[in-house]
C-alpha cells in the first residue's frame, strides 16, 4: 500500500511539474499578423499601384528570416471566401510557414468542408468557442503554444458570432467565458497569452475589457487601416490588421524581465522621431547651435526649449521601459518582388479550379 501511495505522489509531482512553464528571464519575439484576407491570392489594385498578394508576402518574410529573425506568423481569421481557391490559400500558407489560423465566421460560412482544409494544413486551425452543435465539443484546437528564444506564447482563437449562412452543424460558445477559462489554465503554462479575435472593433473592445489577463489581441473582422494608437489602461494591446492581405502587421517584443509589465512604445518612438525632425527643420541645414541661431528671438528660443524638454522626456521614458512592444504596419507594394514558388502554387491552384 505504501508503494502505491509513493507511486501516486511521484506521478502527481511529475504532472504538476510538466504543466508549469519553465522560467525565462529575457528574450525577444516578433509576430507577423494578417486577417480579413478573404480569399485574396494576388495583389489588390489601388489608384496608382497595387498592394498585397501572397507572393510579395512570402518575399518579405524570406527577407526577414534571412536577417536572423524567426517570426511567429498568425492569421486572425476570415481567410476564405466563396471562390473555390481555399486549397490554394492553404498550400501557400504551408509554404510561407504560418503558425496558426483562427477560424472566423466567414471561414465557416464560405467553405464546403473545412475539415479537409484542416487536414491539408501544416499549421493548426484554432478556435476556443466554435463547437459542434450536437455535442457542444470544440470543433478545432482551442489554442496552440509556440516557443521563441525560450519564451512560451499561448495563442488562443475566439470568434464573436457566426453568420446566418453557416452550417447548422456548428454553434458558438460565449467568447468571454471561453477566453477566461483558457487564460486561467494557460497562465501557468506560458509566459504571454495572445488572442486572435474575429469580430467587430466594438466587440473586440468589450472582449478586451473582460479578458484583462491576456497580453495581446489581434483582430479580424474590422477592415479599417491599422494605426499606431495609445495603449489601453488595462487589458491586452489591441491591433487591427486591415483587409485583403494588402499589408502586414508586425509586433516586435523585447523582454528584459518577465516579471515586469509590457510597454507599447510605438507612439513614443513616433513622438521622438517627430521632435527630431522638427529640430532638424528649425536648423535649416545649418550646423550652428539652435540656441545661438535664435538668440535674438525670445519666442522662438522658448519654443526650442520646450521642444527639447519634450524630446528629453520621451527619451527618458523610452530608456526606462523594461519590456517593450513595437507595432508597425508594412504595405506590400509593387516594389516588393514576387516569390516564384508562391506564384507557381497560385498558378497551379488556378488551373485546378478551372478544370
Predicted regions and their residues:
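Alpha-helical protein-protein interaction elements
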Residues: 9-11, 36
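Hydrophobic h-region of N-terminal signal peptides that target proteins for export
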Residues: 12-19
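Bacterial N-terminal signal peptides that target proteins for export
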Residues: 1-7
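Acidic, metal/ion-coordinating pockets
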Residues: 19-355
Amino acid at each position: 500500500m505504501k508503494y502505491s501511495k509513493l507511486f501516486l505522489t511521484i506521478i502527481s509531482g511529475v504532472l504538476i511539474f510538466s504543466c508549469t512553464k519553465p522560467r525565462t528571464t529575457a528574450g525577444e519575439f516578433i509576430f507577423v499578423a494578417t486577417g480579413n484576407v478573404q480569399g485574396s491570392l494576388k495583389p489588390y489594385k489601388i489608384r496608382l499601384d497595387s498592394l498585397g498578394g501572397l507572393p510579395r508576402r512570402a518575399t518579405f518574410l524570406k527577407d526577414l528570416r534571412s536577417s536572423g529573425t524567426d517570426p511567429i506568423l498568425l492569421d486572425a481569421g476570415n481567410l476564405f471566401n466563396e471562390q473555390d481557391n481555399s486549397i490554394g490559400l492553404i498550400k501557400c500558407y504551408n509554404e510561407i510557414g504560418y503558425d496558426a489560423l483562427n477560424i472566423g465566421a466567414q471561414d465557416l460560412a464560405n467553405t464546403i468542408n473545412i475539415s479537409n482544409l484542416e487536414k491539408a494544413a501544416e499549421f493548426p486551425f484554432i478556435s476556443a468557442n466554435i463547437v459542434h452543435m450536437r455535442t457542444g465539443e470544440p470543433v478545432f484546437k482551442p489554442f496552440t503554444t509556440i516557443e521563441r528564444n525560450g519564451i512560451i506564447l499561448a495563442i488562443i482563437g475566439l470568434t464573436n458570432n457566426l453568420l446566418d449562412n453557416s452550417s447548422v452543424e456548428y454553434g458558438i460558445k460565449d467568447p468571454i467565458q471561453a477566453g477566461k477559462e483558457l487564460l486561467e489554465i494557460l497562465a501557468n503554462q506560458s509566459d504571454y497569452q495572445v488572442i486572435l479575435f474575429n469580430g467587430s472593433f466594438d466587440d473586440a473592445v468589450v472582449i478586451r475589457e473582460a479578458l484583462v489577463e491576456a497580453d495581446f489581441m489581434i483582430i479580424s473582422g474590422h477592415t479599417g487601416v491599422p494605426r499606431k494608437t495609445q495603449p489601453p489602461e488595462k487589458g491586452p494591446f489591441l491591433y487591427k490588421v486591415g483587409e485583403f492581405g494588402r499589408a502586414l502587421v508586425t509586433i516586435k517584443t523585447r523582454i528584459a524581465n518577465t516579471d515586469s509589465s509590457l510597454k507599447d512604445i510605438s507612439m513614443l518612438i513616433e513622438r521622438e522621431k517627430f521632435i527630431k525632425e522638427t529640430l532638424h527643420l528649425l536648423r535649416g541645414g545649418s550646423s550652428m547651435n539652435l540656441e545661438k541661431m535664435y538668440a535674438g528671438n525670445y519666442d522662438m528660443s522658448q519654443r526650442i526649449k520646450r521642444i527639447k524638454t519634450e524630446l528629453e522626456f520621451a527619451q527618458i521614458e523610452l530608456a526606462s521601459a523594461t519590456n517593450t512592444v513595437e507595432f508597425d504596419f508594412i504595405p506590400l507594394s509593387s516594389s516588393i518582388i514576387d516569390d516564384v514558388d508562391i506564384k507557381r502554387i497560385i498558378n497551379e491552384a488556378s488551373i485546378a479550379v478551372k478544370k
